[in-house]
Amino acid sequence: MSRQTPARKRRKKYSEKSDAIYHNRLVNMLVNRILKNGKKALAYKIFYRSMKTIYENTNINPLLIIRQAIQTLTPKVMVKARRVTGTTHQIPIDVKPKQGTILAIRWLLESSRKRSGQTMHDKLSHEIMDAARNKGHAIRKKEETHKMAESNRAXAHYR
């Protein structure tokens, strides 16, 4: 007779909280990526100021523009290095929706930090508006990733 352990209790998945004003998880994800050195109040301040700037420039709900920007930035495929018989191949893999959103937010913030001049909330708002219009450095990063995956399509069988 074999001993079987009782069924393990399933842990609840961590649900990301939403912010106080917009009540949106995407906003919370963005703010948590803006965050540096534990200064969450400053991260919220930067985010809300950029929302205000977006609204002043477009007269459209800034949340819609952020969703559109992140949707256009979300990659469908990416490459992953895999070592096969002594050589490293870049293998294209599909990106899950959650991971794609995380990558899009990361690229958006990296490209907004690289912009010259201005304050962070101005740089962030301009990068978000550019991404929504399918322009900007973050869009180039996405296209570069897709191009890499396309050129390494022959190595897809190594998955």
Curated annotation (Swiss-Prot):
GO terms for molecular function: rRNA binding; structural constituent of ribosome. Its main location: plastid. It is found in: Plastid, Chloroplast. The keyword Ribosomal protein applies. Residues 141-150 have a biased composition (Basic and acidic residues). One of its GO terms (biological process) is translation. Keywords: Chloroplast, Plastid, Ribonucleoprotein, Ribosomal protein, RNA-binding, rRNA-binding. One of its GO terms (cellular component) is chloroplast. InterPro entries: Ribosomal_uS7 (IPR000235), Ribosomal_uS7_bac/org-type (IPR005717), Ribosomal_uS7_CS (IPR020606), Ribosomal_uS7_dom (IPR023798), Ribosomal_uS7_dom_sf (IPR036823). Gene3D superfamilies: Ribosomal protein S7 domain (1.10.455.10). Residues 137-159 are annotated as: Disordered. PANTHER family: RIBOSOMAL PROTEIN S7. Part of the 30S ribosomal subunit. HAMAP family: Ribosomal_uS7_B (MF_00480_B). One of the primary rRNA binding proteins, it binds directly to 16S rRNA where it nucleates assembly of the head domain of the 30S subunit. Belongs to the universal ribosomal protein uS7 family. This is Small ribosomal subunit protein uS7c. It comes from Sciadopitys verticillata (Japanese umbrella-pine).
